């Protein structure tokens, strides 16, 4: 269910990288990969995405920091060229933004655009991973929850390698009690 689209159906202002990344994107003709960060339900959440976007841009990657409902803009951006996007497509989403990253991948599946990597951080009730996703990683916390976060599961026919990592599980490299839903992108 795409509840955020009902609460904020206007897709203008979905690109935040001009404000949060603190440096411009490199020339698209000079880069091959496209990395899209989908924030949680409000602009103030997922603050670390702007920082990550800026680091990737300075390293020569094309990256965009987006509001969660930026999935429509992403799909238009990736389908506007006849030959499809150059290089790899990578989606990173937090919370509601992770669900929208999955929805964007789902939209791109019938037109043959692959998502090389899908990274979900703390996504609640995730839809199944679409068939066009090649690899997926899901980092989530199972304790101190207001709503359920759980593992990603493949859609029938999906051959993606899916890694689900419970950061509260025994042996986790994360110090217990320190990480939460709001600071996971700043870590």
What are these regions (language model features)?
Residues 13-14, 110:
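Secondary-structure boundary elements
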Residues 53, 63-69, 75-158:
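Serine-dependent carboxylesterase/thioesterase catalytic core
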Residues 1-2, 159-167:
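Intrinsic disorder/low-complexity detector
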Residues 40, 123, 141, 167-169:
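Active-site donor-binding loop signature of nucleotide-sugar glycosyltransferases
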Residues 8, 19-87:
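Active-site catalytic motif of lipid deacylating hydrolases and related acyltransferases
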Residues 163-187:
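C-terminal catalytic histidine-bearing segment of alpha/beta-hydrolase fold enzymes
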Residues 14-20, 144-145, 182-187:
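C-terminal partner/receptor-binding element of secreted or periplasmic proteins
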Residues 2-10:
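Helix-enriched interaction subdomains in cytosolic or periplasmic regions
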């Amino acid at each position: 269910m795409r509840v955020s689209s009902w609460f904020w159906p206007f897709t203008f202002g979905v690109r935040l990288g001009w404000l949060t990344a603190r440096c411009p994107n490199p020339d698209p003709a000079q880069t091959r990969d496209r990395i899209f960060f989908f924030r949680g339900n409000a602009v103030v959440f997922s603050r670390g995405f702007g920082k990550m976007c800026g680091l990737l841009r300075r390293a020569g990657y094309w990256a965009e920091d987006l509001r969660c409902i930026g999935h429509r803009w992403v799909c238009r951006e990736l389908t506007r060229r006849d030959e499809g996007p150059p290089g790899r497509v990578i989606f990173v989403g937090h919370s509601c933004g992770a669900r929208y990253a999955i929805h964007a991948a789902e939209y791109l599946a019938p037109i043959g655009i692959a998502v090389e990597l899908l990274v979900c951080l703390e996504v609640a009730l995730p839809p199944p991973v679409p068939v066009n996703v090649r690899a997926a990683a899901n980092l989530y916390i199972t304790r101190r929850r207001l709503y359920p976060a759980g593992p990603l599961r493949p859609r029938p026919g999906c051959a993606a390698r899916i890694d689900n990592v419970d950061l509260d599980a025994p042996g986790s490299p994360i110090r217990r009690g320190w990480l939460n839903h709001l600071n996971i992108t700043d870590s």
